[in-house]
């Protein structure tokens, strides 16, 4: 009840996925946002993000965290447009280039 996993379908094929997991009673983490290359540019990532944000709020989370990597420029641009901002590391990612972001829901 406090997490989500979605698969987006387009033209009868799996086009992408997104997940949400609980970190604590008020904080969740966005995981596994991915859209297959053949389906990019159709607004699928944005639609999945809106659904997961709506769900997070409905569950009662007030903060969403995520980690990503610098080469995922399109995703980072979308996250920032949605209001995510940089924060210090919140997990023990083994990659020193990991970017950590937060959104106040």
Spans of features found by a protein language model:
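Conserved beta-strand-loop-alpha-helix junction that forms the acyl-donor binding cleft
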Residues: 37, 65-75, 92-97
